[in-house]
Amino acid sequence: DPDQALVQHIFDSLSLVTPVSRALALQPTESPTIVDVGSGGGLPGVILAIMLPQVHVTCVDAVEKKAMFVRQMAGVLALPNISAQHARIETLEPLESSLVTSRAFASLQDFAQLSGRHVRAGGNLVAMKGKEPTEELTALHAHTAWAAQAIEPLTVPELEGQRCLVWMQRKGTT
């Protein structure tokens, strides 16, 4: 159903733009970067690149066909601020990104353990989730060097389910 795809994928990805923009404005860098892990067909990475042209977005996916699709989208949409890498996130050299995002990628614990080394000092991991993932938060705190900094409710037009962003930072940072 095209209408449902619009809501579940495009509107859902658009709901990330304002919180991400706000967070990047607070970071002391002139060249903000985002790594979108498990990007699939480029959501939310392509949406972020369109809406935040001053930010470079790297979409990472383990499936080559999906990374190729993101590259094709970047060309068709003339987006100079996006790139795609076909790789498992844990195999890449540290990317030193301002934010590392995920949408439907993994548990918070797995996301932090696999992707945390790609966040520069002072940056954040940001996971899009449905309802507040209480059990995942417990595992995150118990088994990783990361802590939830905030859980931000998201409003997605036309979507009846709950959505939230889990903002994470390294333990011991403020």
Give a label for each model feature.
Residues D1-D3:
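Short linear capping/connector segments at secondary-structure termini
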Residues G41-Q54:
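Conserved SAM-binding loop of SAM-dependent methyltransferases across substrates and taxa
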Residues Q54-T174:
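S-adenosylmethionine
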Residues A5-E30:
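Conserved alpha-helix/loop element of class I SAM-dependent methyltransferases that forms part
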Residues P28-G40:
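Conserved class I S-adenosyl-L-methionine
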Residues D12-S15, S39, F69:
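Hydrophobic side chains within alpha-helical segments
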Residues I34-V35, L48, V57, V70:
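Hydrophobic packing within well-folded, soluble alpha/beta domains
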